[in-house]
Swiss-Prot record:
CDD domains hit by this protein: F-box_AtFBL13-like
Stretches assigned to the FBD domain: 342-391
Native organism: Arabidopsis thaliana
Name of the protein in its database record: F-box/FBD/LRR-repeat protein At5g56420
Residues of the F-box domain: 5-54
Repeat in keyword set: yes
Stored InterPro entries: F-box-like_dom_sf, F-box_AtFBL13-like, F-box_dom, FBD, FBL13/AtMIF1-like, LRR_dom_sf, LRR_FXL15/At3g58940/PEG3-like
Taxon lineage: Eukaryota, Viridiplantae, Streptophyta, Embryophyta, Tracheophyta
Length: 422
């Protein structure tokens, strides 16, 4: 009988190397004990994954392991080098730059460095910023002071910068503009990043995510400027105010906008080409310019946490004639509306008469205002196929029964609509 280990050893080296590539490098090295054939096979693995947590968060042992394995590694090119340091590690702070330099010398294509902030910032070598083979670069909790030097990422297509600190306000635009082939960009800002306005000018960019969630940002002068003519998907989350100006974004088909800006007219007025839109605003008064039509919008998700959110819903269903899917959900803690706030039902929108097929409401509470909105949609959505109502988990059995009774007895415009109470 042939043992399992023998059957595995009969596989070709290329196939085995692909399997080993997806394991932590610490586990890959253990395979060298299997047999003579396996003794040096690990040295040709094209993907190296180092994680401090797998070494019991012991810094010296981790640094020694990475040093030794990189020195013994013999693959002429590296598909990826992934370094994750989840706790403060003073020895690694000094060594990461050396490890990255080795990766650059091995023509690395994907580089990821994630670090838990320590007393000393991790500094990356200058050779990284002119690496011609790099296609994916992901950095977290890194200081990019050396980016003030010459920067040229001619092959870079994916760039993720999470909680990164820069030399000055011009460092980030300099990095972005150096990526002539960039298609995917993620920027998550952090306090003390030395940036006031994030400027994104990228002719080839297709997906963009911008996040600012820390309360350390204050004032209206922190924000984003976007000029991305080829962009298809955009995700903007800003919970601490500021602004976002879009100069050129005519081809966006999918957008997530979750912000607390007082005025979003310029932002939403620039993405009228969207087909899918997820929206959470603090106000509906200046959401988008009057007369705007979302002529391509077929899928809308609207957050119900803002006061008078129903007014924004009214505008959107009136201005989205092709809407097929409507989803309502409270994503954040709701700001209580004025006791006198009332909902003015709209004239019958085209989307309800001709297109809406799916209506879903998550975390439904059954308040008077919510019942008004839900019954209006059920009554007038003539082509509605499915309505799914999901109560809040904290709702009592009696409350759920009342919600079900109210909605089940309400008139329905579609004789084929299936009402599901999840």
């Amino acid at each position: 009988m042939v043992s399992y280990r023998d059957r595995l050893s009969q596989l070709p080296d290329d196939f085995l190397l692909q399997i080993l590539s997806w394991l932590p490098t610490k586990d890959v090295l253990v395979t060298s004990l299997l047999s003579k054939r396996w003794r040096f096979l690990w040295t040709l693995v094209p993907r190296l994954n180092y994680d401090l947590r797998l070494h019991d968060n012991t810094c010296p042992r981790f640094s020694q392991f990475v040093d030794r394995s990189l020195l013994l590694h013999k693959a002429p090119t590296l598909e990826s080098l992934n370094i994750k340091i989840g706790s403060i590690c003073f020895t690694a702070e000094k060594d990461v730059g050396v490890w990255v330099r080795i990766g650059v010398d091995r023509f690395v294509r994907e580089l990821s460095v994630s670090y838990c902030s320590g007393e000393e910032p991790i500094r990356l070598p200058k050779c990284l910023f002119t690496c011609s083979t790099l296609a994916v670069l992901k950095l977290e909790n890194i200081t990019l002071e050396d980016a003030s030097c010459y920067v040229c990422f001619q092959s870079l297509k994916t760039l993720h910068l999470l909680d990164v600190k820069y030399l000055d306000d011009q460092s980030l635009p300099r990095i972005i503009s150096s990526c002539s082939s960039l298609e995917d960009l993620v920027v998550q800002r952090c306090p003390g990043d030395n940036v006031k306005v994030v400027t994104v000018t990228a002719p080839s960019l297709k997906t963009l995510s911008l996040h600012k969630s820390s309360q350390a940002f204050e004032g209206d002068d922190d924000g984003f400027l976007i000029d991305t003519p080829k962009l298809k998907r955009v995700d903007i989350e800003d919970y601490w105010g500021g602004f976002c100006y879009i100069e050129n974004m005519p081809e966006v088909v999918e957008a997530n906008v979750d912000v607390i800006y007082k005025n979003t007219e310029k932002l939403l007025g620039s993405i009228t080409s969207v087909k899918r839109l997820a929206l959470c605003l603090i106000t509906s008064d200046a959401a988008y310019p009057a007369g705007t039509i979302f002529s391509q919008l077929v899928h809308l998700e609207l957050c119900t946490c803002a006061p008078r959110w129903w007014d924004l819903l009214t505008r959107l269903i009136e201005d989205s004639p092709k809407l097929r899917v409507l989803k309502l959900r409270q994503k954040h803690i709701r700001r209580a509306p004025s006791p006198r706030a009332s909902w003015k039902q709209p004239a019958l929108p085209k989307c309800l008469l001709f297109h809406l097929e799916t209506f879903k409401w998550e975390l439904y509470e059954g308040s008077q205002k919510q019942k008004e909105v839900a019954t209006f949609i059920l009554k007038h959505a003539i082509r509605l196929k499915t309505a799914i109502i999901s109560p809040k988990p904290t709702s009592t059995l009696l409350e759920k029964h009342e919600m079900l009774k109210d909605l089940s007895s309400s008139p329905r415009g579609s004789s084929t609509c299936e009402l599901l109470f999840d």
